[in-house]
């Protein structure tokens, strides 16, 4: 846990309960955590802090079926902060969404180091540790 105190994680989810739950888990493990409820607030935090990892909900506008604002945000983060590791989380995973997140784009970039359905959050801390250990 000592190393975690130096790691800063950005949690982005439009649902307050999820932001609270995810940030609470990470804070309990000793991570520094900042939370955002939208792509705009996430980008503002990226201008303020240096993050090791961003944990992004894929569907950042809950009221819009098929919304994938989190994928768009992941792409922007890759562009402006290429060193930030990205883990996507969602309650609405589809094979197409997973493919978009994990396969290289036209420039050879992969949007996310990992993709976690929200019903598998028990493995979240282990996945984050593994992703942060990647060089």
Regions found by a protein language model. Give the residues of each.
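Alpha4 helix (beta4-alpha4-beta5 surface) of REC/receiver domains from two-component response regulators
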Residues: 68, 72, 76, 92-117, ...
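Conserved phosphotransfer cores of two-component systems
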Residues: 47-49, 76-84
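Two-component/phosphorelay signaling modules centered on CheY-like receiver
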Residues: 16-34
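Acidic, metal-coordinating helix/loop segments flanking the phosphotransfer/catalytic sites
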Residues: 10, 23, 34-53, 61
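Non-catalytic signal-transmission and effector/linker regions of two-component phosphorelay proteins
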Residues: 1-10, 16, 40, 119-135
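A generic structural signal for alpha->beta connector loops
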Residues: 6, 30-32, 83, 109-112
């Amino acid at each position: 846990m000592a190393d975690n105190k130096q790691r800063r994680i950005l949690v982005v989810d439009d649902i307050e309960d999820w932001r609270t739950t995810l940030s609470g888990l990470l804070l309990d493990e000793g991570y520094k955590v900042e939370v955002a409820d939208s792509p705009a607030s996430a980008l503002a935090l990226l201008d303020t802090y240096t993050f090791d990892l961003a944990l992004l909900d894929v569907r950042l506008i809950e009221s819009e079926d098929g919304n994938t604002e989190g994928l768009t945000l992941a792409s922007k983060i890759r562009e402006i902060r290429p060193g930030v590791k990205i883990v996507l989380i969602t309650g609405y995973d589809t094979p197409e969404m997973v493919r978009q997140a994990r396969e290289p784009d036209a420039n050879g970039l992969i949007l996310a180091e990992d993709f976690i359905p929200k019903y598998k959050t028990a493995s979240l801390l282990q996945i984050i540790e593994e992703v942060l250990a990647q060089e």
